């Protein structure tokens, strides 16, 4: 029996934090995960998290693809009902190329009303939008 380990890089910081320094910290954590033999690195996604600051998921995954090679990079999770499917497909296809084919798409329907309001998408329609976007 074997087990693969994944490191989750939250990338969530208090207002006023030095985000350039935090980005370097995340890069170092990702490199350490690779050195320690982790199978993958997962990057979450949240919006409207004030007063907290976040790195955008796709930007962070692209950055990590340039920093760490030969490790799985995982969207954990992309909130698919909030986005246009073609845009998401192109973004993550690019990350897959940048990572040498090591990208894994994780998606979900979301649960925070503030994120749906911020994107102008009714939360009550998230299941329907998720299915439609997944099919597209």
Language model features with spans:
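Flexible, glycine-rich active-site loops centered on histidine and acidic residues
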Residues: 2-21, 82-136
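Positions that flank functional sites
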Residues: 48-49, 79-80, 111
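Generic, well-ordered alpha-helical segments
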Residues: 52-56, 80, 87
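Glycine- and other small-residue-rich loops at beta-strand/loop junctions that grip anionic moieties
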Residues: 53, 77, 126
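Structural motif
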Residues: 44, 76, 106-108
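Secondary-structure boundary/capping signal
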Residues: 72-73, 103
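N-terminal beta1-alpha1-beta2 module of alpha/beta enzyme domains
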Residues: 1-67, 71-72
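Active-site nucleophile and cofactor-binding loops and adjacent substrate-binding regions
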Residues: 75-83
